[in-house]
Amino acid sequence: MDKLIIQGGTRISGEIRISGSKNSGLPILAACLLADSPMDICNLPHLNDITTMLALLRCMGVGVTINEKMCVEVDPTTLTDTEAPYELVKTMRASILVLGPTLAKYGKADVSFPGGCAIGSRPVDIHLSGLEAMGAEIAVEGGYIRARAPNGLKGAHFVMDKVTVGGTENLLMAAVLAKGKTVLENAAREPEIVDLADCLVAMGAKIGGIGTDRLEIEGVERLHGCTYTVMPDRIETGTYLVAAAATGGSVKLRDTRADILTAVLQKLEEAGAELEIGESTISLDMHGKRPKAVNLRTAPYPAFPTDMQSQFTAMNAVAEGTGAVTETIFENRLVQVNELNRMGANIKLEGNTALIQGVPRLKGAPVMASDLRASASLVIAGMVADGETVVDRIYHIDRGYECIEEKLQQLGVNIRRVPG
């Protein structure tokens, strides 16, 4: 397995471009299955998860080509199979997103139970009960979800037991081709869901309440292809901002948006960062200062995102003062704490809260990534540590960050990848 080797002690400085959003690109690629003509999807990041989703579409018989504009052309009209096999699904949870659109368009879908990061239980019960409310017959056997709706799906009023991003996406994609009106209550409001909904509307879907927790969908008979540009990655944006803040440095990020990161930017200002917001840029400057510790609690959007918790935990480890970080979304999301403590951090766990007493510097050490965002926190920790840090099992980081070592090198970080 590849490793990242980081020589700590450099203040970040420079300018980089932010990639397209993985968490938006994956459901939008799944939504291509709903169209009856080709789709052009632009600004997709070059990431393992995106590659896996494209491989899954190809496995189903869908035509996938990269055009001269570096957009991915997806032709769903060549689909030959409504099964998503275990071999592809096991590596990525987002594979479950083909369930709703495949069932809605073709009346049947067989999707293996998904894999992905080891950050706690992410059950798909809400996906399944929502589809059943829309008239689907669902059996779970042999590790597969087997869904049938031979007469098509029917509109329904469905209240989700808890806020679920994947569940909202799956049910939204199923509802756009269902007969009649569907109302989804307690829907997730994440910007990636807004992006998916905007793409579906561009394909001819009728969706009301976009960006709220109540989505109203009037089913249509068909959806057409379109050209759509995926939104910037707000978590990648936040990660590089935190890296600059933790190192006392400065950074300018291009091709991003501040309006989808309000809670994160607020916490960075609390930490002492000076921010400058442009139309598609965000600049941060710490003026060489050590960050101040911040308290935060993760919650569904528009509150503080769970995907940014690990990075702020790493920043708090070298901040002035004491910060409390409470994780309410995923139960195993504080696993990076043990690795940070091995680097000299002073972090105590109390249930789902990390109490972090900042220290001036960490010490380089060999550490191991356990999930995508925890691995990003260890890279940040390596930047603020004395000496060399070796981050192992970085296949996690390659699932969510495009060219991370190249981008950090552009910002002056002494980092290199060593093949396993």
UniProtKB/Swiss-Prot annotation:
Its EC number is 2.5.1.7. One of its GO terms (biological process) is regulation of cell shape. UDP-N-acetyl-alpha-D-glucosamine binds at residues 93, 307, 329. The keyword Cell division applies. The keyword Magnesium does not apply. SUPFAM superfamilies: EPT/RTPC-like. GO terms for cellular component: cytoplasm. GO terms for molecular function: UDP-N-acetylglucosamine 1-carboxyvinyltransferase activity. The modification 2-(S-cysteinyl)pyruvic acid O-phosphothioketal is found at residue 117. It comes from the Bacteria. Belongs to the EPSP synthase family. MurA subfamily. Cell wall formation. Adds enolpyruvyl to UDP-N-acetylglucosamine. This is UDP-N-acetylglucosamine 1-carboxyvinyltransferase.
